Amino acid sequence: MVIRYKKLIFVDTNDNCRAPMAEMILKRKFLTNPLTIESRGMVVLFPEPLNPKAEAVLTSNGYPQPSHIAMQLEQEDINNDVLILTMEDKQKSQIWETYENAPHVYTVKEYVGENGDIPSLHGQPLTVYSQCYTELELLMRKLVTRLNEEEEL
């Protein structure tokens, strides 16, 4: 049985870099089934804006004035028609340990048939942010293919 997700949430540590970049990239892709796309963090102490390096990389890739405010993943974000994709395996485990009824939690790479994590960018130079953007762009293409193929079933 194919699950028809109504929402997809990307999750990273504090929702100011990798997850919002993935969200913004995916929102520009064509999905055959309308899907609400959001991002959240595991540890959001206050609603901070997008990381300046992530913002610079997005701007240089044609996202004019990307804006984002970090939000904490909450129990009410999670239900049976929500697909949650984490950047790292430890975040997936944290969600299973912290939240109830989280049946559809995968890492981004796991969901598209790859192994490994999308590593944290904390303290990294702009070039590493750019490399992460390129990796996320490729992963989002694979994700679109998977989501659209599931819609056809």
Describe the residue ranges of each PLM region:
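Conserved active-site segments centered on acidic
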Residues: 1-80, 145-153
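Phosphate-binding/catalytic loops
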Residues: 89, 93-153
